[in-house]
């Protein structure tokens, strides 16, 4: 059984957060939105006390700072889709673990494309990890095989090397 995708929305505008939540759930009702956060401080605290979600939707301009400050204060291993009204931060955003950069107002088709991109990338990574594990099993040269065998010959036991 596939685990539900866990998502965090970091957005200081209540209407924008509500609209994004609705659009995500329309795209896939199975996506679990585990937190909606409004500030850098609240986000840093949340990431320090909770496991990283699969995906973060992140506005850049938050009430207390630019969201990039989150990454200076706490390790975030989640994939990120930036959602912002400002295009000037795109290069900086893609230097992080950014999957996409959506300009507000977010259009359904662009959100769907970003979520599909995330699913494709994570599917690719999962397949790559499986292939690597299979390769490691096949090519395991460190594996030790038995060098001695005992066999019964009549009433005696003989050792073979």
PLM regions with names:
Residues 7, 33-34, 80:
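Hydrophobic/aromatic residues located in beta-strands of well-ordered beta-sheets
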Residues 30-40, 46:
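Short hydrophobic/Thr-rich beta-strand motif most characteristic of the beta2 strand and flanking loop
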């Amino acid at each position: 059984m596939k685990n539900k995708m866990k998502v965090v929305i970091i957005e200081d505008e209540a209407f924008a957060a509500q609209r994004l939540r609705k659009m995500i759930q329309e795209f896939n009702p199975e996506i679990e939105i585990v937190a909606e956060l409004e500030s850098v401080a609240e986000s840093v605290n949340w990431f320090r006390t909770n496991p990283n979600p699969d995906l973060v939707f992140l506005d850049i301009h938050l009430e207390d700072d630019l969201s990039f400050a989150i990454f200076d204060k706490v390790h975030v291993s989640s994939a990120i889709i930036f959602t912002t009204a400002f295009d000037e931060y795109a290069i900086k955003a893609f230097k992080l673990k950014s999957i996409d950069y959506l300009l507000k107002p977010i259009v359904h088709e662009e959100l769907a494309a970003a979520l599909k991109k995330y699913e494709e990338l994570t599917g690719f990574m999962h397949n790559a990890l499986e292939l690597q594990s299979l390769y490691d099993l096949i090519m395991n040269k460190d594996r030790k095989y038995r060098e001695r065998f005992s066999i019964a010959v009549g009433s005696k036991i003989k050792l073979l090397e």
